[in-house]
Amino acid sequence: MSPAFRTMDVEPRTKGILLEPFVHQVGGHSCVLRFNETTLCKPLVPREHQFYETLPAEMRRFTPQYKAVLIFVRCADEFGASGNIETKEQGVVSVRFEEDEDRNLCLIAYPLKGDHGTVDIVDNSDCEPKSKLLRWTNKKHHALETEKNPKDWVRQHRKEEKMKSHKLEEEFEWLKKSEVLYYSVEKKGNVSSQLKHYNPWSMKCHQQQLQRMKENAKHRNQYKFILLENLTSRYEVPCVLDLKMGTRQHGDDASEEKAANQIRKCQQSTSAVIGVRVCGMQVYQAGTGQLMFMNKYHGRKLSVQGFKEALFQFFHNGRYLRRELLGPVLKKLTELKAVLERQESYRFYSSSLLVIYDGKEWPEVTLDSDAEDLEDLSEESADESAGAYAYKPIGASSVDVRMIDFAHTTCRLYGEDSVVHEGQDAGYIFGLQSLIDIVTEISEESGE
């Protein structure tokens, strides 16, 4: 059984697992689902799947760990689906679309484990929704569910689905206008659980993707997802910066219209000038106890100076600059640049670079503190006074730099590509060098 499924196996067979939206998704338009604490589900794009399957060894530490392929296959009824894992060891899940009490679409996975690792196929009754799992209210979701005429119900159901789709489009338009948002966080609570219904970008991507999947269920037999490492799982308050890298975003297979649109976006943003632009940001501001969200529409409007200020804001917690993070970031950016300079014929068109660190404030502890103080460190509340730390727990200064999104990546290993490039991806490397220069400038100006 794939390691990604061990968590599911300990659950009773009648219980389901809610495939939640990944609340720390700050950019992109693909729906990313949280499979478990350490694993994410992302819609499979053949080219991206090929990239992970043929990934050069020296690039692995700069990308999320690739785990498996998950296939959702439509069940006998229009609202059900089953899935299996394409790994050396087989595992199977059944999935269904349901609605929560707020009428939002949910995708539920039910583990099906047979003897000796074989697959059990069960009838649809085993896929009934579990009220405890989804925290349903006892009231009926549809007043029309009790109607005798099925045609009336179907007509009403289709009408409601169209209204939902239209509402999602309106909410996305609102998101485009609301380019920077703030959300107050309770310090004692789990940040990820608090954000389940409040990260505006991940929620809208989630609902839009599930709505499309449900609408297309009658015309499509299966959906494929890849399982990837959840890069934010080891951070208590993940601060995430999504940077669109390179001077060119369209793939070689893009239509003329698509290519022209991507060229225009690059020309009108910092992509053309410095080879990088902000695609999304989530940062914790300790001064106000708020998470700040910046979306890609704001990122496109930034000047080079505005980009630098956004980068400064990402490393600033509202009280002081997190200077201890700048050195590790520079080290990893420099190492990544050296690795990419050795990659022949690769082009990472429309790929992003994630920078992640923990926004949790760690209390100041002196070096002569007793063992009990150090043992209880992770449970103490944040120190309200700003200043340098005499002692930092392991991970307090940890920062991660990873490449993601390879749907338009190409190299000569992909034999079916009509265009084969020579040498390095100069546009991506140019963007990395710009990042290195700007972070270095921020570090020097702050007295690092």
Curated annotation (Swiss-Prot):
**Pfam families listed in its UniProt record:** IPK (PF03770)
Q: Kindly list the positions annotated as binding ATP.
A: E229, N230, L231, D242, D405
Q: Could you say which EC number(s) this protein's record lists? A: 2.7.4.-
- Kindly give the InterPro entries that the UniProt entry links to this protein: IPK, IPK_sf
List the Gene Ontology MF annotations in alphabetical order: ATP binding; flavonoid binding; inositol hexakisphosphate 5-kinase activity; inositol hexakisphosphate kinase activity; protein-containing complex binding
> Its GO biological process terms?
cellular response to flavonoid; inositol phosphate biosynthetic process; inositol phosphate metabolic process; negative regulation of cell growth; phosphatidylinositol phosphate biosynthetic process; positive regulation of apoptotic process; protein stabilization
Q: Where does it live in the cell? A: Nucleus
Query: What keywords are annotated for this sequence in UniProt?
Result: ATP-binding, Kinase, Lipid metabolism, Nucleotide-binding, Nucleus, Phospholipid metabolism, Transferase
Q: What does this protein do?
A: Converts inositol hexakisphosphate (InsP6) to diphosphoinositol pentakisphosphate (InsP7/PP-InsP5). May play a role in the regulation of Na(+)-dependent phosphate cotransport, possibly via its role in diphosphoinositol pentakisphosphate (InsP7/PP-InsP5) biosynthesis.
Protein name in UniProt: Inositol hexakisphosphate kinase 2
Recorded name of the encoding gene: Ip6k2
